[in-house]
């Protein structure tokens, strides 16, 4: 699964358009700074792995990142940084669409801690 903010989603765009490589995402804008990668060097390999694994790529609405980050913090108890709002949004969407099935084990990567 690839999850990106709709403010910077070059991998999702390439995946949805069945492209073999990513294009530079001009005017990238996201509060999830760790995911602000408008020109991923490994775009080709990411897309190849997604294709070979029957993966999926989804975007999270930039306007929902803060609330999704807070929802994750309350539910899981980890004071994660805003990037988790993208991850949590994708998890909720894929669970709702039954792409993630009930009882399936899922690992959500929270790679940053909020500094206060």
Regions found by a protein language model. Name each.
Residues 2-80:
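Active-site/ligand-binding loops adjacent to catalytic centers
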Residues 23-26, 85-116:
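Phosphate-binding loop/pocket of nucleotide- and phosphate-handling active sites
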């Amino acid at each position: 699964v690839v999850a990106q903010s709709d403010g910077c989603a070059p991998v999702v765009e390439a995946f949805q358009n069945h492209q073999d490589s990513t294009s530079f995402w001009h005017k990238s804008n996201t509060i999830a700074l760790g995911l602000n990668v408008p020109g991923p060097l490994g775009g080709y390999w990411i897309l190849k792995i997604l294709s070979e694994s029957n993966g999926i790529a989804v975007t999270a609405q930039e306007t929902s990142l803060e609330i999704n980050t807070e929802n994750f913090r309350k539910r899981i108890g980890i004071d994660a940084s805003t990037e988790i709002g993208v991850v949590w949004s994708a998890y909720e969407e894929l669970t709702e669409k039954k792409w993630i099935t009930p009882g399936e084990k899922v690992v959500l990567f929270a790679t940053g801690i909020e500094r206060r």
